[in-house]
Amino acid sequence: MTSFFSDYQPQKTVQPTCYEEVQETIKKANRDRTPLVPVSSGTNLQDTHLPSVKDAIAVDLSRMNKITYLDARNRDAVIEPGVTFAQLEAPCKAEGLRTLTAIEVPKEASVLGTYLEMMPLYGWPKYHPWEMLTMKGVRADGEVFATGQMAMSQDRPDKYSWGVSLAQVARLYCQAQGTLGIITNAAVTLKTIAPENQVFFFSCNNISRATKVLKAFIATEEPHEIFAVNKTYCSELLGQGDTKNLPPWTVVIVTRGFEKAEIAYKKKDLTALAKQLKGELATRLGSVKNAGAKILSEISNPTGFSLHSEDGSGWAPVVTIATDSQIQKAAGLFPKDSGSLIMPLQAGGCFYYQPDLRYSLGEEKKVRKTYLTICEKLLKAGVTFPRPSALNAKQVVAHNPSYFKLLRSIKKGVDPNNIMNPKKLGL
C-alpha cells in the first residue's frame, strides 16, 4: 500500500459489515490509543486512504456495500461506503439516472468515499459541490451521529430529497473519510440521463487564453461539463500516441439535453460566443477520430491512474485551487512533459488546477523533492491546497497556522485521543 505520497503501511486491516461493528472498532481504538485510517477504496488522487503515521489500523469499509434506498422521483440514493460507482450505476440506469463521476476516479471506487474526499467531479461547474445531502455514522469518540434529515424521525420514504438546507454541518465531514468520524450511510444526489449529448472543442494557444475562455463559456450556464487540458493531458484523454497535431490547450465543453433542437439552440449560442472570443467552436479536434465520443466515455467511465502512466512510469498530480493569475504564474514551474487540467469553479472566480509530475519508477526520492519545491512556491503565490497530501501537509500548515489551529480545535472536541486519521489535514 505504499505510494509516491506515503511510506506507511497499516499494521493490520479490519473489515466491519455494519455500523455497530464500526462503532466497536472505534471504541476499542480509543481504549488502546490505536490510530485508525478508514478505506472505502484505494482509488483517490493522492492516496489519502493510506496512513500518515506508523502502526495504524486500516478500516476497510468495502463489505458495507448496500444501496439501502433509491428514490428515482427525487433523484437520490442512500448508500453505504462500500458501494462503488459500478454497483450504483446499474439500478440508476434502469431508472434513467446517472451518478456524478469524478476526474481520474474509476468505476471500482467508492461513491461515498469519493464524495467525502472531495474528489473533483466533472459536474461541479454545473451543479456545484452538493453531491451529498445528509449522512450518518460514528464519531471519533465512538458516539453515533447523523446530520440533516437522517437525524430526524420521518414517516415519509423520500425524506432525503429536501436538499441541503438542514445539513450544513455535514460539510465538516467532507475532505477526509474518518477525520471526525466514519460515515456509514449517506444520501447522494443523482442526475437524469440526457438522450442528446454534444461535445465541443475550442483551441487555445496558451494557458492564459484557456482560463479566459473557460470564464466566458461557464458564464452562459449552458455547459454540463467544461474543462481545459494541455496537449499532454489531451493526448492521453483521447488515446493518442503523440501530441504533434494537438493545440497547446483545448477547452472541452459538453452540453446535454432531451431534444436535438435543444442542443442545436445551445450550439448557436455557444458558437456566437466563440466568435466574440475570436475563435472557433468545433465538434472535431484535428485529425482525432471520435474525439467527442471518447470524452463522453471518459466522463461516464473515468480511466483512473492508468490514463497517465504505463509500466515503469509514475504519475503524481498536484491538486490545487487557484485564480487565473496564479495559474499563469504556476505553469512555468512544471516540466514541459507535464499534463495539466483546469476546471472553472464559482463561475470562474477560481479554478480547480491539476498539473502533474511524470517520472520513471525508481526516481521517487528525487521527484518528491521537486514536488515539495514546487508546492512551496505555489503556497507563497497564494495557491490553495484543498486536500493536502501526506508529503506537503507540513508546508500547508506552516503557511496557514491560524486556520489549522481552528480546525484542530474542532477535531480535538470530537476526537480527544486523536485516533482518527492522525496528521491528516482534511476536515
Name each model-derived stretch.
Residues 15-16, 36-40, 47, 59-61, ...:
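General beta-strand structural signal in soluble alpha/beta enzymes
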Residues 209-238, 324-336, 367-375:
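Short amphipathic alpha-helix segments
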Residues 2-64:
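Glycine-rich N-terminal segment of FAD-binding domains in flavoprotein oxidoreductases
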Residues 67-70, 81, 85-212:
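FAD-binding subdomain of flavoenzyme oxidoreductases
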Residues 21-24, 87, 207-213, 259-268, ...:
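Short, conserved charged micro-motifs
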Residues 5-6, 49-86, 123-124, 190:
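Glycine-/small-residue-rich beta-strand-loop submotif within the FAD-binding core of flavoenzymes
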Residues 197, 203-209, 243-281:
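A conserved active-site cap/scaffold subdomain adjacent to cofactor or substrate pockets
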Residues 8, 47-56, 60-62, 273-427:
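Conserved glycine-rich FAD pyrophosphate-binding loop
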